[in-house]
Every structure is written in C-alpha cells, then in structure tokens.
C-alpha cells in the first residue's frame, strides 16, 4: 500500500510539473493574465514607479512574508520604494507559473528569484490575485515568501 501511494504521489507530481513547466504552453488567456505581472517586473527593472503602478489595481496591497513575519504595504508605497532611481540593477523572475482563471478573477502562483546586479538576492513564491476590469487584467494583490537560502541560478 505504501509503495502504491508513493507511486500515485509521484505520478501526480510529475503530471503537475509537466502541466506547469513551460511558459510556452500557456493559453492566450493565461498569457493575458501573466502580462500585467511581466509589466510590473519590467517597471521594477527600470526603477520606474509609474510603470510599476500601471498594471496594478488602485488601492491594492502586498503582503511580504520574511522570517515568518508579514510586512504589509500598499501598491503605492511599494512602487515608490522600488521605483526610486538607483545604480543597482534589480530583476525579478518567475518560473513554472500556475494560472487559474474564473471569469474576471485569476490567480498566479509561481516560484521566483529576485536578482540584484545579476546575482540571486532572495527567492520564494509569488502569489498574484488579478481582476479583469473593462477587459483589462490588473493585479489586485500580491503575497510572497522571501528567503535567502536560494541556490545560485
């Protein structure tokens, strides 16, 4: 029984990995949901507060989990903090996103790495809640975990 259960778990994990392993396999609707996430990351890399805010629902919030403690902030505060001009290059990368859509509501769950000057600074999991307003997907809230024990990528 134990071996059978293990085989079922491994088969399920393998199937889940195959389903979420490629961004190229995303449907057009999933790509539309991922577009505002990419736009926010592009704004972050440019250190452009206005570009960071563009794909965000006004009044939205973030919860950043660090060392088991939540830090909450508004999208405006996040954009002002990350959107300040600076000399360091920042980049956030997600991979293997899991996208779920129901009418005008979507969720994206994805592992991420945050790079500073090309080196992994921290990693974790991003969770984006999105809403479709007037035909356009907007990020309504973000939660993430962040830890330093990442393998260098």
PLM feature segments, named:
Residues 1-11:
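Bacterial N-terminal signal peptides that target proteins for export
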Residues 12-13, 23:
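Cleavable N-terminal signal peptides
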Residues 19-54, 58, 153:
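Short, low-complexity N-terminal intrinsically disordered segments enriched in polar/charged residues
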Residues 45-84:
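N-terminal, post-signal-peptide region of Sec/Tat-exported proteins
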Residues 56-58, 66, 110-114, 126, ...:
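A mature extracytoplasmic/lumenal domain signature
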Residues 61, 73-121:
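Surface-exposed, charged secondary-structure patches
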Residues 123-148:
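Short beta-strand edge/turn micro-motifs at domain boundaries
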């Amino acid at each position: 029984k134990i071996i059978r259960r293990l085989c079922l778990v491994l088969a399920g994990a393998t199937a889940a990995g195959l389903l979420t392993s490629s961004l190229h396999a995303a449907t057009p609707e999933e790509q539309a949901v991922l577009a505002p996430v990419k736009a926010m990351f592009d704004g972050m890399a440019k250190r452009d507060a206005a570009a960071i805010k563009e794909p965000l629902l006004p009044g939205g919030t973030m919860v950043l989990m660090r060392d088991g403690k939540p830090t909450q902030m508004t999208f405006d505060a996040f954009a002002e903090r990350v959107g300040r001009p600076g000399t360091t290059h920042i980049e956030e990368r997600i991979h293997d996103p899991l996208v779920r859509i129901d009418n005008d509501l979507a969720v994206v769950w994805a592992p991420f790495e945050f790079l500073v000057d090309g080196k992994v600074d921290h990693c974790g999991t991003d969770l984006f809640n999105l809403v479709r307003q007037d035909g356009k997907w907007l990020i309504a809230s973000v939660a993430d975990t962040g830890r330093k024990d990442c393998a260098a990528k």
